[in-house]
Structures are given as C-alpha cells and as structure tokens.
Curated annotation (Swiss-Prot):
GO terms for molecular function: ADP binding; ATP binding; proton-transporting ATP synthase activity, rotational mechanism. The lineage of its organism: Bacteria, Pseudomonadati, Thermodesulfobacteriota, Desulfuromonadia, Desulfuromonadales. The record marks 362 as: Required for activity. Produces ATP from ADP in the presence of a proton gradient across the membrane. The alpha chain is a regulatory subunit. It catalyses: ATP + H2O + 4 H(+)(in) = ADP + phosphate + 5 H(+)(out). It holds the Pfam family ATP-synt_ab_C. Its EC number is 7.1.2.2. This is ATP synthase subunit alpha. The gene is atpA1. Its main location: membrane. It is an enzyme of class 7 (translocase).
C-alpha cells in the first residue's frame, strides 16, 4: 500500500482543527505538619469551611480551621501513610454522604462507606453532612406517638414523633437496651431507624447488629459505626452523617428514628480535635462551641408541618454520666437542648428494677400530647402513685405499726413497681401495656403474691390473645376506653383471675 503525502497532511490538519485544549485546574497545597488525624496545609487560600480535600492515597479530609497562612483539616481515614510535604487537592465540594433506601439493612462507617462485607452501596443520591435545621414555619408540634414498647416509658415518659428525648445514666445501666428495644418495637410499622455508634468497641457494635438481625430489625435499620479504634474526626462526624441519612426519609414525608450512642464520646472526640487545632479551651477543657456542636445536631430532629410533607425525625441521644452526676457540663447542655430525659439509675438497676428508670427525675416535655387516650386514662395517676409509694416506703422503714390504708398503698406500689419491670428484647404493644396497668390500678393484683406477677402477666397476655382477641383489636383501634369497653375488660380480667387463682 502506497502512502500518499497529501493524505497524511490532511489527517494532521483535521486533528489540529479538532484539537480541544482541556486543562484540569485544581488548587493544591502542601502539608506542613500532620499528626493525630489533623493536617496543617499551606497554600489552599480559596478553601471553604467544611470543604472536602483529597489527600494522597485517595483519603478524604475536611477543612475545619481557616487561618491567615494555613488551613487546619481533619483527615477522614487512615493518616499513617500521609507525610509532610505531600500535596493536597481541593475538591470544591462540601462534605457529603450517600443517602437513600439502598442504605437500609447496611452497616456503614462515618462517611457512608460499607463495612459489613456485603458489597458496595448502589445510590446516586448524596446529601451534605452539615445542613441548617428546618425553621419554625416548617415545623409542627409533636402529636403522634413513637411507641418504645417499654411500659415504664410509654406510660410515664411518652415519646412523640419528632421529639428529642435524652437517655441519660451511668455506664452499665441499660441505656443502649432502651434504645435497641425501641428499634425492635418499630417492626411492622412505618419507621426507618438509624443507630449511630460513637466510640464504642467493635465487639459491642457487632453484638447490637446481631441482636437487631435476630429480631428482624435490620430490615428497616441503618447502622453508622465510628468505633473506638477510629480517629477523632470520624467519631466527631458520625452523628452528622447519621442525621443526614435520617433527614432523607423525613423530607420525603416518612418517619425516622435516630439513636446517638453516645454523645459524650462525640464531645470528647471534638475536644481532642479542637485542642489539636489550637482552639482555646473552656470549661472541662471543652471548646467554647461544644454546646453548638450538639444543638445544631439535635435541632435537625423535628416534626415537619403538613405543607412540608408531614415527615418526622425522632432523636434519642444517649449521654453517659460519671457517678450519677447530671450537673456536669455535657449532661446539662444536652438536657437543656432536648425535650425531656429518661434518667436511668444504677441503684435501681442493681436492685432488679429494669429498665432502671428513675420516675422522679425523668420527664417528657412534649410527649404527653402524643400519648394515646387509652394510655392517658390508665397511666394518669401512675407517676403520682409511684412517688407516694416511694415516700411511704421510706417512712415505713422506721415503724412497723402502719394503718390499713398505708399498708394497702404500699402493697399497690410494690405491685406497680413489679409490673413496670420488663425483660430486654420483649417490647409490648400499646393495648397490652394498657391492660396490665389497668389491672394493677383496679386492684386485680392486690391479693396476688409479688413473686407470681411475672407469670400472671405472661398468662394474661396469652389469655387475651387466644380468647379475647376481639377486645384487644377494639382497644387497638379505638385507642380509648369508654364505659362499655371498660365493663368488658373488667369482666375478662375477673374471668382470668378465677382461672389463674384456681
């Protein structure tokens, strides 16, 4: 084949005509120091606060400090291979995480990458980690119940959809148990759950995931884990990633529940970050904006107005206290941000009252409006009765000759305390809770020995399930007890009492 010169020149001319000058311009900087997950970078003069940076080896970073001559950034990943003198690139994007239905049933790290070995997450939807919370106009007051399945919670410190209810207590008092039971209780409902584990042992997180899987709760749950072995920046950002995933469902008009386990460890991680970034320390060496750290997170949980879709995001933050000191810096901060708290006490826990809820110190500021009418009817005096019982029990220790009324009150109180105990991983439906509290309030348990109450309760539920199913379903549908229904419940309880005592 003969090569013709004019053909070659024509091809060259064509290529020159079609040549497009594509140059990728990116602003770069040089690492001047790195350690403990914090990098100081020189040369990124156009960087934005919260912007993602690209470190060598594909590791991401997030801009936290903007100073005159350098930028302080948190490395979101393994930083041991990053050295001084390495080049860092700006991405022009604010920190974001994947969101959507594809995350349900998965365990991800603080930046949304899967860590459960089930392959990549297929989603094209990303959302910014730091978003401003909805304004006043976009919100609506809490009016729907978020059933926890725990008698003590649903009766005395009810939680509503869109509420922020703090779970506070010393270590090993059952804080995570309350949260996990609440997730398990959402089975068969319309609530998507997000469990954010911050600074916990990996074995503990694996245990929680296994329990959720055993009860079929992973079908509607996302787990975000920033374990104790991960760097402070990842522990700091994990709750924001979790709430961003929850907001996706809230903004679609769905209902979501998020658990932060626990925010004390996030505050410690943020303190570490701030001190490494040379920010001035304040009380307990926390930085001045540690209140804003938690308030901007918890304000993102709310009930949206009907015009905005009517979705909700309910938050159950957990705070660990030291030796029951609720007046420390972080506990008081979070108590003042949330709409109430469930206070778990170690003395109650060790005396066998589980969940170990201290009724006197626990409160729900907005949940009462969301409580079902039937529960309000039976649990209205419960808190007062228990408080009076505790007072009487304290006095009864001094003397033995008590009048009949006091003895009856003590006996009733003892039985109320007993029926509010509940085994872990066994949440109850609203109508069954109403029945057992109704039985206690109306004297059906007064003559029974306290030791038989657990068996009484289990057999009573079985009796209503098998022989009074229509009454149970009516109570479930009506959500209130009228005179006719009350008569039927009393008759059924009388019948069961005869059979139980026989």
């Amino acid at each position: 084949m003969k090569i013709r010169a004019e053909e070659i020149s024509e091809i060259i001319k064509k290529q020159i005509r079609e040549y497009g000058k594509e140059v990728e311009v990116s602003e770069t900087g040089t690492i001047i120091s790195i350690g403990d997950g914090i990098a100081r970078i020189h040369g990124l003069s156009g960087a934005m606060a919260g912007e993602l940076l690209e470190f060598p080896g594909g590791v991401s970073g997030m801009v936290l400090n903007l100073e005159e001559d350098n930028v302080g950034a948190a490395v979101l990943g393994e930083f041991t291979a990053i050295k001084e003198g390495h080049t860092v690139k700006r991405t022009g994007r604010i920190a974001e995480v994947p969101v959507g239905e594809a995350l349900i049933g998965r365990v991800v790290n603080a930046i949304g990458e899967p860590i459960d070995g089930k392959g990549p997450i297929k989603t094209d939807t990303f959302s910014k980690v730091e978003i401003k919370a909805p304004g006043i106009v976009a919100r609506k007051s809490v009016d729907q119940p978020m059933a926890s399945g725990l008698k003590a919670v649903d009766a005395m410190v009810p939680i509503g959809r869109g509420q922020r209810e703090l779970i506070i207590g010393d270590r090993q008092t059952g804080k995570t148990a309350v949260a996990v039971d609440t997730i398990i209780n959402q089975k068969g409902g319309d609530v998507i759950c997000i469990y954010v584990a911050i600074g916990q042992k990996r074995s503990t997180v694996a245990q929680v995931v296994a329990k959720l899987s055993d009860h079929g709760a992973m079908d509607y749950t996302i787990v975000v884990a920033a374990s104790a072995s991960e760097s402070a920046p990842l522990q700091f950002i994990a709750p924001y990633s979790g709430v961003t995933m929850g907001e996706y469902f809230r903004d679609k008009g769905q209902h979501a529940l998020i658990i932060y386990d626990d925010l004390s460890k996030q505050a410690v991680a943020y303190r570490q970050l701030s001190l490494l970034l040379r920010r001035p320390p304040g009380r307990e060496a926390y930085p001045g904006d540690v209140f804003y750290l938690h308030s901007r997170l918890l304000e993102r949980a709310c009930k949206l107005s009907d015009e905005c879709g009517g979705g909700s995001l309910t938050a159950l933050p957990i705070i660990e206290t030291q030796a029951g000191d609720v007046s420390a810096y972080i506990p008081t901060n979070v108590i003042s941000i949330t709409d109430g708290q469930i206070y778990l006490e170690s003395d109650l826990f060790f005396s066998g009252v589980r969940p170990a809820i201290n009724v006197g110190l626990s409160v729900s500021r907005v949940g009462g409006k969301a409580q079902t009418k039937s529960m309000k009817q039976v649990a209205g005096t419960l808190r007062l009765n228990l408080a009076q019982y505790r007072e009487m029990a304290a006095f009864a220790q001094f003397g033995s000759d008590l009048d009949k009324a006091t003895q009856m009150q003590l006996a009733r109180g003892e039985r109320l305390v007993e029926i509010l105990k509940q085994p872990q991983y066994r949440p109850l439906s609203n109508e069954k809770q109403v029945l057992i509290i109704f039985a206690a309030n109306n004297g059906f348990l007064d003559e029974l020995p306290v030791s038989t109450l657990r068996r009484y309760e289990d057999e009573m539920y079985a009796f209503f399930d098998n022989r009074q199913a229509d009454l149970l379903s009516e109570l479930r549908d009506k959500k209130a007890i009228d005179d006719e229904l009350k008569k039927r419940i009393v008759a059924a309880l009388e019948q069961f009492k005869k059979e139980f005592s026989a």
